[in-house]
């Protein structure tokens, strides 16, 4: 407060929560760009592309829901969808379901939650290698398992992405642990994302920009993607919002979106929508019952999603055959 926003160009603004820091950075770049009447990307670097590849996102879900989410993403113009795997659903069944509905141009980025050991995850990746729809896997191993990452990368053909590198991202790159790295959320602020993005580009290693928000944050990610030479794609969860503060949504055509050319972020806020959202009562979450039916005949009841590794002692994906349902 009371400071010149130009004091914070490329600053991390580390106030404890990366999403808030990056949201604040987006607001500052919007203000600076509008002050100078230039697009925000001109304050970040030299523009190298007019459009940036973008990915849709969905929550962990059973195969039949995953099929519908893929169709939704295709209908919205995406060629790529990210989803976290989880203990409760079978990634092989999800992949089989995806192959039945996805067009040949479509790919999945699975996030494996950085919770497994090499002996568990390698056989899973070897099987997924046979699927044309699996494009990449994020965080297949515990992040601090440096030797495991190196050995896994040597043994699999699936490109591996690392999110939240424990050594800061550049040491992991020098050790050859991953084929690409996630920048943005949970990895430091905007300055860190820009610095690592340029460093990865110099090393000819792709990065993925991940932020969370609607059109405003999506625009910010596109401005970053406009100047980083080796950006693979962005993920912002914009596809999950039925409502948005912007007067116009950013289009997705053939898997990519145009970099806004207006001053600042290049997105205009609908003030009337903003006021309606401010006045709205918070949504109430329903209480849900989780039912896990194991292959041996046992049934486990839980409040919501149970922590199966803690309850039954096996790593995600190492035991198959159970079915999980949620009921209100």
Identify the role of each PLM range:
Residues 247-328:
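C-terminal extensions of enzymes
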Residues 1-3, 12, 133, 144-159, ...:
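Shared catalytic-loop signature of beta/alpha-barrel
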Residues 1-35, 298-303, 314, 322:
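Metal- or metallocofactor-binding catalytic centers and their adjacent structured scaffolds
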Residues 24, 37, 81, 137, ...:
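Conserved, mostly hydrophobic/aromatic
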Residues 25-30, 41, 96, 122-125, ...:
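Predominant activation on well-ordered alpha-helical scaffold segments within soluble catalytic domains
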Residues 45-156:
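Metal-dependent enolase-superfamily TIM-barrel catalytic cores that perform enediolate-based chemistry
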Residues 33-34, 38-52, 257:
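N-terminal amphipathic alpha-helix/helix-capping segment at the start of soluble metabolic enzymes
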Residues 39, 79, 107, 159, ...:
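Residue-level detector of anion-binding/catalytic polar loops
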């Amino acid at each position: 407060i009371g400071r010149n926003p130009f004091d914070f160009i490329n600053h991390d603004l580390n106030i404890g929560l990366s999403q808030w820091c990056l949201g604040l950075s987006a607001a500052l770049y919007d203000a600076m760009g509008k002050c100078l009447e230039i697009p925000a990307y001109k304050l970040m670097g030299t523009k190298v592309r007019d459009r940036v590849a973008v990915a849709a996102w969905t929550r962990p879900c059973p195969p039949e829901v995953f099929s519908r989410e893929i169709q939704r993403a295709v209908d919205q113009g995406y060629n790529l969808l990210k989803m976290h795997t989880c203990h409760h659903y079978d990634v092989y069944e999800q992949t089989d379901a995806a192959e039945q509905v996805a067009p040949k141009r479509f790919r999945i980025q699975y996030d494996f939650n950085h919770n497994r050991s090499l002996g568990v995850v390698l056989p899973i990746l070897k099987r997924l290698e046979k699927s044309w729809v699996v494009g990449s896997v994020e965080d297949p191993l515990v992040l601090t398992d440096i030797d495991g990452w190196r050995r896994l990368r040597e043994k699999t053909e699936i490109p591996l992405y690392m999110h939240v590198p424990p050594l800061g991202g550049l040491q992991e790159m020098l050790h050859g642990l991953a084929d690409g790295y996630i920048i943005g959320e949970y990895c430091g602020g905007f300055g860190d994302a820009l610095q690592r993005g340029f460093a990865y580009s110099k090393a000819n290693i792709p990065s993925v920009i991940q932020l969370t928000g609607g059109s405003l944050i999506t625009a910010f990610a596109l401005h970053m993607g406009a100047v980083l030479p080796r950006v693979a794609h962005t993920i912002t969860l914009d596809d999950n919002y039925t409502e948005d503060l912007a007067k116009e949504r950013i289009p997705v055509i053939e898997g990519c979106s145009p970099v806004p050319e207006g001053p600042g972020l290049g997105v205009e806020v609908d003030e009337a929508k903003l006021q309606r959202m401010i006045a709205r009562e918070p949504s109430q979450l329903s209480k849900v019952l989780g039912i896990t039916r194991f292959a041996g005949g046992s049934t486990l009841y839980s409040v919501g999603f149970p922590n199966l590794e803690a309850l039954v002692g096996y790593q995600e994906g190492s035991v198959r055959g159970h079915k999980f349902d949620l009921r209100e």
